[in-house]
Amino acid sequence: MTKKYVLALDQGTTSCRAILFDRDSNIVGVAQKEFTQHYPKPGWVEHDPEEIWSTQYGVIAELMARYNVNPEEIAAIGITNQRETTVVWDRNTGKPVYNAIVWQCRRTAGICDELKAKGLEEKVRYKTGLVIDAYFSGTKIKWILDNVEGAREKAERGELLFGTIDTWLVWKLTGGKVHVTDYSNASRTMIYNIRELKWDEELLAELGIPASMLPEVKPSSYVYGETDPNVFFGHAIPISGIAGDQQAALFGQTCFEPGMAKNTYGTGCFMLMNTGDKVYESKNGLLTTIAWGIDGKVEYALEGSIFIAGAVIQWLRDGLKLIESAADSEYFASKVPDTGGVYIVPAFAGLGAPYWDMRARGTIVGLTRGTNKYHLVRAALESMAYQTRDVLSAMEADSGIKLQALKVDGGAVANNLLMQFQADILGVPVERPVNIETTAMGAAYLAGLAVGFWADKQELVAKYKVSRRFEPTMDEQTREKLYKGWQRAVTRAREWEVEE
């Protein structure tokens, strides 16, 4: 039977999706289902790995049935996933020893403080490209080994396995035959040496993590194994692409050359710039991370994460009840020519790159008697664009590369007012692609390339279509005046929360 499709599995923080792409990179079908978020204590976030698997498997089955797809028509499967989220399971039974600890979970902040007190920050940054933070997998693994009864003993005996979500899904899809991850996901664990491309023995010893738990690290476009026919509707299909969600979006946006960048506007924002074979050590609060491994080489990226982006619009809707739906924000914001001098700094959970200020809190500044709800809605939207400029300035400073255009994706990019303001405040064009499912697209591309479904990256570049290009129209003087106002507003939000 002709191989017509590539199946992308997009395992996100709140939902599992299965998306089918054809040779022309068109979406043939989508199935999606949300799963449960567990909050056992304030600041703790967990997922049930078995529920993630059953939900992911369910959407695959739903997709095949709804669009009448024969598994034989699928050339390959690509996986993209929420990064850093940590699963530890028993090698023999296949059962998790604890819930998955999600990337947002802050329970290991104390372990991070201990590592910082030991003076390990420079070493961790040099080896892993990351800052010491509860966000990454390393301290989560340590927490499970230290706090789940019998876990450490089992791990020492070689009976436990660790994986990020990609690893867990491949293990399940192959019927427990393959324990693997890719370079991009490994680079988010805080225990992987991104220069030497191996698990770092010194950091493993520091955290007390046995090397026997760790998956083998492979390229992002590579045949890792095949689905177990008993699991996958009687068929053995190659699993041949893996990348963490943000790296997958960079690939899906065809940012294949150094200096190309994309920004994903979701709950938060994630901006990545391809830096080719260069490992830039950030002096400006960015992360250095592996973009992907393909064609026998590893390429790197600079990454800046903004904690609150689209979430500020949800807050206007649910917290303040200023709007009824997220789509209203563009209409309300367009009622006024500007914010009337109002700035909102949405530091609800501290500030991410380039500040990394956990004690910053949200502020609204510049209010006058003339301020109305339209000004507030507009200021909330503009905060996403200002934060993006903060990150871009840091990237340009670290890499010495001047951005030519910003490629964008994610839910909020449908907002034309936001995209135009983004182009204006950056002073560079903003490109919105026809297909905004770039994360799944990236996973599909990586998988398809590994099995020859697509010939090479050039073929993918030719398929990339821009739906709209927003050119900057603001003059330099206005742009800099507005941005200086934003910088002043940020200083008001910094270090607000005081330790009791």
From Swiss-Prot:
Catalytic activity annotation: glycerol + ATP = sn-glycerol 3-phosphate + ADP + H(+)
InterPro entries found in the cross-reference section: ATPase_NBD, Carb_kinase_FGGY, Carb_kinase_FGGY_CS, FGGY_C, FGGY_N, Glycerol_kin
EC number(s) given by UniProt: 2.7.1.30
Residues reported to bind glycerol: 83-84, 135, 245-246
Record flagged with keyword ATP-binding: yes
Binding site residues for sn-glycerol 3-phosphate: 13, 83-84, 135, 245
Any GO BP annotation: glycerol catabolic process
Residues holding ADP: 13, 17, 267, 310, 411, 415
Activity regulation as described: Activated by phosphorylation and inhibited by fructose 1,6-bisphosphate (FBP).
Positions bound to ATP: 13-15, 267, 310, 314, 411
CDD domains per the UniProt record, alphabetical: FGGY_EcGK_like
GO cellular component, one term: cytosol
NCBIfam families for the chain: glycerol_kin, PRK00047.1
HAMAP family: Glycerol_kin (MF_00186)
Role this protein plays: Key enzyme in the regulation of glycerol uptake and metabolism. Catalyzes the phosphorylation of glycerol to yield sn-glycerol 3-phosphate.
Annotated protein name in UniProt: Glycerol kinase
Lineage: Bacteria, Bacillati, Bacillota, Clostridia, Thermoanaerobacterales
Gene: glpK
